[in-house]
């Protein structure tokens, strides 16, 4: 279920003026509650994986520990999560960036080396990347291993269904069992509900 539209690689024109209103929640204007942080959240089939910049890090161990201590999250230690991280890294082809750093990033690399700081190349979820530099506007060559080109097609191949332009409002429950999902249809531009349920 996705609130936004279904877009494919042929729709990604590498134009910010088109991509931001079409692919981002609130046209890239979504903010944290206090307005201090812009939240880059996708609004199309594939969600935020469609518009992220492909950096693929494992959740840091201190973060996992914080979740356990503050929120009581169990079964998510670094050791517990390691096989799941490995599985997703394989599925999404996560590997260090294959090309040397560009000129501006090479300055950072040289600075790190002169200051004695450790650095390494960012791990990315790509396969056959052309390094066009427009990851945040949808990948026009399907190299980014977003849910649009990985998990969703795999689910559809196994008989799953895809519902888009549908805002999920609430789960329908019978006791502790989910029996359905109440959705509200969205208009073609995904700006407002169209009244369909």
Region spans (language model):
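Flexible, glycine-rich phosphate/dinucleotide-binding loops
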Residues: 7, 128, 190
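Conserved beta-strand-loop-beta-strand element in the redox core of flavoprotein oxidoreductases
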Residues: 170-197
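A general structural signal for short secondary-structure junctions and capping/turn motifs
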Residues: 41-43, 110-111, 153-154, 196-197
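Short, glycine-/Ser/Thr-/acidic-enriched flexible segments
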Residues: 5-6, 57, 167-169, 186-188
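N-terminal glycine-rich phosphate/pyrophosphate-binding loop and immediately adjacent elements
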Residues: 1-67, 78, 182, 194
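Pocket-edge structural micro-motifs
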Residues: 41, 52-54, 121-123, 164, ...
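Conserved redox-cofactor binding core of oxidoreductases
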Residues: 70, 74-171, 175-178
């Amino acid at each position: 279920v996705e609130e936004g539209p279904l877009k494919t690689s042929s729709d990604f024109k590498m134009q910010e003026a088109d991509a931001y209103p079409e692919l981002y929640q609130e046209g890239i204007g979504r903010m944290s509650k206090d307005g201090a942080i812009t939240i880059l959240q996708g609004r199309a089939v594939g969600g935020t994986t469609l518009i992220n910049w492909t950096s693929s890090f494992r959740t840091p161990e201190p973060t996992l520990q914080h979740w356990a201590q503050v929120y009581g999250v169990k079964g998510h230690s670094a050791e517990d999560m390691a096989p799941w991280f490995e599985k997703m890294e394989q599925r999404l082809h996560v590997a260090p960036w294959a090309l040397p750093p560009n000129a501006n990033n090479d300055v950072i690399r040289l600075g790190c080396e002169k200051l004695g700081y450790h650095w390494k190349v960012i791990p990315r979820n790509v396969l056959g990347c052309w390094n066009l530099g427009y990851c945040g506007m949808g990948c026009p060559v399907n190299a980014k291993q977003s849910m649009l080109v990985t998990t969703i097609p795999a689910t559809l191949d196994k008989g799953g269904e895809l519902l888009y332009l549908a805002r999920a409002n609430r789960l329908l429950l019978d006791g502790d069992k989910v029996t359905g999902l109440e959705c509200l249809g969205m208009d073609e531009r995904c700006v407002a509900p169209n009244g369909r349920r």
